[in-house]
């Protein structure tokens, strides 16, 4: 970790248009910030204990394609991501973020369960 940089990325799915339209811009930004903090705070705490200070990115969009796109743009050496394991039926109906990242990402991907 001494000569490597680390990026911690979270991608929130966009809210449906009818929900976005019902919120002010400030409310939408506050919601996105709160949801991002829920995801990132425990990870940042864990990484800090191991003296890792990552660059943090937060985006809104389709998680699978956005993760792959950012990995390509930022020239990541590897993507390490969790797999929530929705099961075969969940993947069939919705597709998993991990599956979409694997399909769209030219960067090596390590899935952690």
Regions inferred by a protein language model and the residue ranges of each:
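Short secondary-structure boundary segments
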Residues: 11-13, 82-84, 113
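Structural beta-alpha unit
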Residues: 45-79
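Intrinsically disordered or low-complexity boundary/linker segments at protein termini
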Residues: 16-20, 78, 104-113
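Short, well-ordered secondary-structure micro-motifs
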Residues: 18-21, 68-69, 91-93
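Small/aliphatic-rich secondary-structure junction motif
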Residues: 1-22, 46, 50-55
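A short acidic, glycine-rich active-site loop
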Residues: 25-38
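Glycine-rich, Arg-bearing micro-motifs that act as flexible, cationic patches
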Residues: 78-103
């Amino acid at each position: 970790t001494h000569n490597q940089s680390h990026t911690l990325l979270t991608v929130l799915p966009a809210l449906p248009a009818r929900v976005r339209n019902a919120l002010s811009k400030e409310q939408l930004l506050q919601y996105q910030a709160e949801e991002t903090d829920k995801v990132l705070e425990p990870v940042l705490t864990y990484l800090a204990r191991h003296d890792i200070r990552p660059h943090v990115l937060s985006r809104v969009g389709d998680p699978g394609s956005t993760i792959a796109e950012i990995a390509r743009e930022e020239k990541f050496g590897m993507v390490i991501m969790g797999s929530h394991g929705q099961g075969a039926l969940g993947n069939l109906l919705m597709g998993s973020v991990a599956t979409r990242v694997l399909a769209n990402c030219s960067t090596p991907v390590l899935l952690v369960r």
